[in-house]
Regions:
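Catalytic donor nucleotide-activated moiety binding site of glycosyltransferases and closely related
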Residues: 1-40
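PLP-dependent class I/II
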Residues: 10-13, 54, 118
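Hydrophobic/aromatic beta-strand patches that form the interior of the parallel beta-sheet core
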Residues: 15, 37, 54-56, 74, ...
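C-terminal alpha-helical cap of glycosyltransferases
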Residues: 135-150
Length: 150
């Protein structure tokens, strides 16, 4: 995260929540404590969604939920070919079905963030396809359905 701090400067902080299977291997150095905040593995990821301005993810499905917030999502997949061919594969066409391009290097990722390079129309298209029922009135629809006279 030293490169991230150098590139992003004082304008950003990172809320870091690694996968629960590898979280015990991470330690944030003391001189990065005011830049990288380690999220407890037991803490609900939804808490992070509420306080974040953007999401950086790899292969996690968290982007489906986060997309509904209408905020930038960056896909950092430095090992894309290995993951696709030898590990798990995908349930979507990557990168075509994603709400943003895939980047494979830290340099590309940091440049996209610094340049505020995000295609909001692509995100809207993604949400129309994968989150079509999220129109801000879910509670109203539930109450109407439960208490309808018919």
């Amino acid at each position: 995260f030293y490169k991230w701090k150098r590139e992003l400067g004082e304008d950003y902080v990172v809320l870091f929540k690694p996968h629960y299977l590898i979280c015990s291997t991470y330690h944030i150095p003391r001189d990065l404590k005011n830049f990288v905040f380690f999220m407890d593995p037991n803490q609900d990821i939804n808490d992070a969604y509420l306080v974040s301005d953007a999401l950086i993810t790899d292969y996690s499905s968290v982007f489906f939920d986060y997309a509904q917030l209408g905020r930038p999502i960056y896909f950092y997949m430095y090992d894309l070919e290995h993951y696709a061919e030898e590990l798990r594969g995908f349930y979507l066409k990557v990168p075509d079905d994603l709400p943003n391009d895939v980047v494979k290097t830290e340099e590309e990722l940091l440049k996209m963030i610094k340049d505020d390079c995000f295609d909001y129309q692509r995100l809207r298209t993604f949400n129309e396809r994968f989150n079509p029922w999220n129109d801000g009135s879910a509670c109203e629809k539930i109450v109407s359905e439960v208490f309808s006279e018919t």
